[in-house]
A protein has these predicted regions:
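Structural boundary micro-motifs
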Residues: 2-169
Length: 169
């Protein structure tokens, strides 16, 4: 009986320590996103300029002029019918105007949190999620639920914390 209580005490203590370490990492992600991620404005042609675009395109994070999920992960690629640059959200072309865009590659690997090591964020957050298949999406996390703009419950392989939704904590 006493051994079980002692074991439970040390497990709780270990979990609290992991959560506090995770929160420090989450704060580093938010600070990095706020201060260090380059935000580019201008036309898509200017953004890509002399950079060769892979056939599948590249993922960009952008701030769009819309109410639901103003931050969105979109894919920049050339349309198959006229080779024009276009943005897509999943299978849908994205026609919302954007304030800025940045490449997902601008987020350092060392700040991404693995779901294996950190199963969920410590508080309600806005996340950039990687599904391990080259697909990225902005996801809201609250009340133990990961939700996309289309309200699909999802579970990524790793995530990058963009912002805390509950600023008071």
């Amino acid at each position: 009986m006493i051994v079980k209580r002692i074991k439970a005490y040390f497990e709780k203590r270990k979990e609290r320590k992991r959560i506090s370490e995770q929160y420090v990492l989450e704060k580093k992600c938010v600070e990095y996103f706020d201060k260090s991620v380059p935000r580019r404005t201008g036309s898509l042609e200017k953004l890509i300029s002399n950079t060769p675009l892979p056939e599948k395109g590249i993922y960009l994070l952008g701030k769009f002029n819309k109410d639901s999920f103003p931050l969105q992960a979109v894919r920049l690629h050339r349309s198959w019918w006229n080779e024009r640059l276009m943005l897509s959200y999943g299978d849908y072309s994205c026609h919302s105007t954007y304030e800025w865009l940045t490449s997902v590659e601008n987020f350092p690997d060392g700040l991404w949190l693995s779901v294996e090591d950190y199963p969920r964020p410590t508080r309600p957050t806005l996340l950039l999620c990687d599904y391990g298949t080259g697909h990225y999406e902005v996801v809201g996390y609250a009340h133990k639920t990961w939700t996309t703009e289309l309200c699909f419950p999802v579970k990524p392989t790793r995530y990058f914390v963009l912002d805390f939704l509950d600023k008071e904590k």
